């Protein structure tokens, strides 16, 4: 089955689930017959969440630099089930218009996406990749065009490899690197995006990446882990 057919079938199935039984999507029991979306109240936001590495593909296109997950999956494929990687993934980079239209068709109100740090800063800091900047403008504009609220996450596990080569999250300089990166994206898109998130699960990318070895960069380094989690929290505070 090709990507388009899979996405269409998935969308149809999910749409049906939303209409008839929304809590099934969360794996929760339904105890109230007739429970509907409206019962959550007018202020509850229904949305879709995704991360750059998981959906974008185009891992080395249009000036993007490698992330630690590119390196991890290429150099340690045995760490990944079936040796998969996200070099192409869902190819959101080339199909974002259609994919966001599917979100709208499913009657979701919000699309929470993440920026690829190394698509915007190929070396992590310094030089800005204008093609990366332009891509996220197109994504955000497509959301606004269709009435889908864009929520932006600044970091979802995919540190630029150039910064990992300098010590990554275990290097205290990451606080300044993160500040430079987040300042750029918030000033660039702040007039369009009103809801922002700093990091996805800091314990996940620090513990998994620097101690448990199941996330990029895949180290067993207790001292690095302790520094990394401290620096990640410092970045949140900054």
Task: Name the predicted role of every residue range.
Residues 5-27:
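N-terminal export signals
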Residues 28-32:
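Short gly/ser/thr-rich secondary-structure transition/capping motifs
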Residues 33-74, 123-124, 137-238:
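Active-site region of glycoside hydrolase catalytic domains
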Residues 66-101:
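Aromatic- and Gly/Pro-rich amphipathic surface segment
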Residues 77-87, 116-121, 217-220:
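Short glycine/proline-rich turn/loop motifs
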Residues 87-97, 126-135, 172-180:
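Glycine-rich anion/phosphate-binding loops
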Residues 100-155:
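Aromatic-lined substrate-binding rim segments of carbohydrate-active enzymes
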């Amino acid at each position: 089955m090709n990507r388009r057919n899979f996405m269409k079938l998935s969308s149809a199935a999910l749409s049906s689930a939303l209409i008839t039984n929304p809590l099934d999507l969360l794996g929760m029991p339904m105890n109230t017959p007739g429970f509907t979306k409206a019962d959550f109240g007018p202020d509850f936001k229904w949305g879709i969440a995704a991360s750059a590495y998981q959906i974008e593909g185009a891992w080395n296109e249009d000036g993007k630099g490698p992330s630690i997950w590119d390196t991890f999956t290429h150099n340690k494929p045995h760490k990944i089930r079936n040796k998969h990687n996200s070099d192409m993934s869902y190819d959101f980079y080339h199909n974002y218009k259609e994919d966001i239209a599917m979100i709208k068709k499913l009657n979701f109100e919000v699309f929470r996406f993440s920026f690829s740090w190394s698509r915007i800063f190929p070396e992590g800091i310094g030089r800005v990749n204008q093609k990366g900047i332009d891509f996220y403008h197109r994504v955000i504009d497509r959301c606004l065009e269709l009435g889908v609220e864009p929520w932006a996450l600044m970091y979802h596990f995919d540190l630029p490899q150039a910064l990992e080569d300098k010590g990554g999250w275990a290097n205290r300089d990451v606080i300044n690197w993160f500040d430079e990166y987040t300042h750029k994206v918030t000033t660039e898109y702040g007039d369009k995006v009103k809801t922002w998130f700093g990091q996805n699960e800091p314990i996940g990318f620090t513990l998994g990446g620097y101690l448990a070895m199941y996330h990029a960069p895949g180290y067993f380094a207790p001292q690095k882990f302790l520094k990394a989690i401290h620096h990640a929290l410092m970045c949140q505070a900054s």
